[in-house]
Structure formats: C-alpha cells, structure tokens
C-alpha cells in the first residue's frame, strides 16, 4: 500500500535475516522517520550497543548504522526517494561478535509461553517478540502518515481560490504568512525574493558568504553592491591563483548549530592520508578539546565525514586548530578569525612537497537533506570509514577499488 504525502513518496523497510517478517511504510517527512528511528533505538537500547545494519538496494556492502553521521546518510537516501533496507541480522552480528538485542531473555521473560516462539536456524535465535516490537514502532509511523494524509486531502480551494496549507508544526511560517492579506503584499515578497536569489547567485549559492558581506558593509545602491561583489570575487580568484600547487592547505568552516561540529575531509591527492590523527581545538575562552579521526586511512579521492557533539559551554571563536599524527607531531595548524574560516598549513618539512595539496572541510547543516542529530547518541569511532566523493558513489561502488569506496565487513 502506497500513500502519497506532500507529492513525494519513498518506502521504509525493516527485515530480519531470515526474511520471515517484512514491514514497509511510505513517508516523506524526515522528522517522522527520525522519530520512528529514535523510538526504535530507545526500545533496543542501541545507545549502549549501537549496532544496526543497512544497505542501499543492489549494493553488496552492508553498512553499520551506529552514529549521527550514518543516520544522516540513511536520511539522504530516503529523502531522495531511493528504496533502502535496514537489516537486523543475528547471524551477521554473531559473525562480527556484535550485539543488538542484548540478552535474549530480556525479550522473552514475563510473557505468555505461546509468545516465546523464536526463529531457529543454524543455532541462531531471534526472538519473535523482538520482531513484534519493530512492528509496533512501524504502526506508530503509519498512524503519523495517516494523520499527514488527512491534512493533505483537505480542500485546497476556498470559494474557488487556490490556497496553501501550512504545516501545523511550523509556527514561524504561520506567523509570517498570516501578516499578508492581499495579493499585492505577496507580490512585494516575491519581488524581494528575486533580489535575494540574484544576490545569492553572485556568491555562488553560499549563504554564509552573502550574509557576511551584508553584515560587514553599510547600505549601498544596487549598482555599488554588485560592483563590490565583483571586486571581492576578483580578489579571491587572484589570491587562489597566487597559491602554489605544492602549498599544503586545508580550508575549514565550522558551524555550531545544535552545539555540534560536522565537517568532511577530502583527500584530493594521489597518496593515502594515514589514520589515527587527532584534531585539537583551543581558544582563550574555552577549554582545549580534541577529536580523534579514527583508525581508517583516507584513500585516494576518498573522504572522511565526522560529526561530533563536544557540548561546548561557548561557541567556537578565534580558536586555533591543530592536526596531530599518532607520533604526536603537529602536521597541520591554523587559526580561525571572526569569518569562521581557517587555512591550515603544515609546519613540517616532510609535508611541504604537496602531499596534501588542497582539501576542505564543509559543514552540512541543511535540514532538508540531513537528519538533525541533536537527539542521537555520540559517535562510535569504529564506524567512521573512508567513503567516496558525492557524485561518484555509483562509479566507486561498481569499481574494484578498496581505497575510495565503503569498506565491507570482510575487509575490516
């Protein structure tokens, strides 16, 4: 059964390893799916055991769903309407000496003997009550979908005029649009939006750069503003041309939304970047804290995505960032100013031959594309792996390379 909600649709499956029970429910609201997953995590105590498997359709590499970053990747697949399976397999968990359900008697005690039937094959047991719990959680999801469907099916016309139904969980939208009573007022908003779009295009779609430009400059005419933007772009391009190819730079942009740090390290070189590095942050107004990159190397044209919740008492500002290798050597260092952008350079002669060339950290804070992970658990370093660049996923999956694609469990 497929239920259309807000013009888009995708399927969500939960399957046990023997495929005795399969449940599916369509939905488009990322928040609803995240809520269902959160309830699933709470029920299975995954915050302690942190082991669920998932994989895109047609791909052989099963992924470990264990931290906020992995939930974000799963959310992207679902948001793009790609069918995706979540596998809960005791056979696989036992093979890798992992655990998801905890002691089996936790799911069978204090229940009717007839309920204590389990799937038994090759000495592997999965409690049927465990599957029933999954079914209950998906029932909650279906009820939420039905409620959303009823809202969508409400009449979208009032006295022959078209209208827009605003979601009840977005009070800021309701407050904003309730101020407009005439088409003239909406036309003015539309004209302002076209100006905003044109200005945003001048900054290459980078909202932070545009906001920084508007905040740091006094009001000026449209012609002067465009002129200043062009000058700024020319200076930036000139500075980029003056940078030598062998200058090992990493450009960092850190966001403090949700009190989290979320960035990606790209390896655009022709060598492998070693693992077990540590990122150290320090400033005059906050304590020094460090983030471990994890044991996995970053392969050629690979990337490492990190998402952390350091619970900082104050936002990061005017801080120094160091990248320290496992021998305790600082291989990259730089200082962030008010612009919240930082250039890291290597103080070591061994890295002056262009081994890092150029790379960048990017924040991913778009709530329409990534799960907001403020309610999820802290990362498990063992699950941070080397993954391919965006746009190269299918090519890398189908290639034989082990440096720039997700690792299989056998390779780990």
Curated annotation (Swiss-Prot):
GO biological process, one term: protein-containing complex assembly
Chain residue ranges for the region called AMS1-binding: 246-348
Membrane-related topology note: Peripheral membrane protein
Superkingdom: Eukaryota
Pfam family, one: ATG19
Keyword Membrane (UniProt): yes
Cellular-component GO terms for this entry: Cvt complex; cytosol; phagophore assembly site membrane
GO MF term set: protein-macromolecule adaptor activity
Subcellular localization(s) per the UniProt record: Preautophagosomal structure membrane
Keywords of this entry: Autophagy, Membrane, Protein transport, Transport
Role this protein plays: Cargo-receptor protein involved in the cytoplasm to vacuole transport (Cvt) and in autophagy. Recognizes cargo proteins, such as AMS1 and delivers them to the pre-autophagosomal structure for eventual engulfment by the autophagosome and targeting to the vacuole.
Quaternary data: Interacts with AMS1, ATG8 and ATG11.
Protein name (record): Autophagy-related protein 34
